[in-house]
């Protein structure tokens, strides 16, 4: 009764937002009801967070009637609920799951609890042990949940859609092709310039003739490895009085076949289809393409008729005669050029003075020449040595001796 009187005498606080002010002062915050007869106080909130999140009640002198609190999810249990749960007997355990017999099919129902969830597809060893007639029970040990494999919605691809890759033709499959040009690539051919310098002799003999003023022509070539059509620019550069033939726009071809310094390109001629074919050859490739000589190409276009034997200087040389017959043979201790020089006769060199060129005539006809005014004196003073041939007393007015 004393608690009831204190509740009625306590004034209402209109500005307090919490329902905790409706409780009598001095209550223990344990969630228990007050010990008194006829107490009609509302129950205390479960926690401090619930007191702040609870809906505000209208302030009045009499205790309000609160609506029932809806279940908004799992809340932490109160001390009274924990004590009641501890005093109540535990629920009976669920019945054990019977093991599957070995003869049951895979379509039988499986347990839905997490302790019995297994992988959908068993391994071959597990299926072998379960299918054996030893009657061993399946282990009830819980396993981790595994991801299901989507096998029903995915259909296997038909065998016709998996077409095999086309066989790559060999780089030496040159049936019906004639080799007309082969070039070993240098640093300038595989650089970023994108052009390959061709040998002049083969380019002028087998490739198309450049008749335009700018000296350019588009040249299409089929790739020997993958039958791709390449379009190059065939041109020449004036080099003094000669020409230098170049194949431009070759950068993509070099990068496609990964050509490096020392590799080679081979150009073929397909006479049947009247086209050009280009192939790449690595440096380690032992099989080399045979390039025909220009004389053989000319002989096929213009056949050479046999020459009649004529007994004059125009008759051809006998085949058994070798050019070594005209070269003098050297001794074992001397070179061939030393033998040729030693076989030449010695040519005597005359002792001629420089002043003799200005005195070709006698003294009477050279009176106007002041350089030879003292010719008689210079002639009498000149004394030559027999061994050296030089003058012992040279004339200062005369020129140098030869």
From Swiss-Prot:
GO terms for biological process: flower development; photoperiodism, flowering; regulation of DNA-templated transcription. Transcription repressor involved in flowering time regulation. Represses the flowering activator EHD1 by binding specifically to the DNA sequence 5'-CATGCATG-3 of its promoter. It is found in: Nucleus. Expressed in anthers, pollen grains and young developing embryos. This is B3 domain-containing protein LFL1. Its main location: nucleus. Disulfide bonds: none annotated. Coiled coil: none annotated. Residues 88-102 have a biased composition (Pro residues). It comes from Oryza sativa subsp. japonica. Plants overexpressing LFL1 show a late-flowering phenotype. One of its GO terms (molecular function) is transcription cis-regulatory region binding. One of its GO terms (cellular component) is nucleus. Keywords: DNA-binding, Flowering, Nucleus, Repressor, Transcription, Transcription regulation. Residues 181-284 bind DNA. Residues 74-87, 103-139, 156-169 have a biased composition (Low complexity). Residues 1-174, 381-402 are annotated as: Disordered.
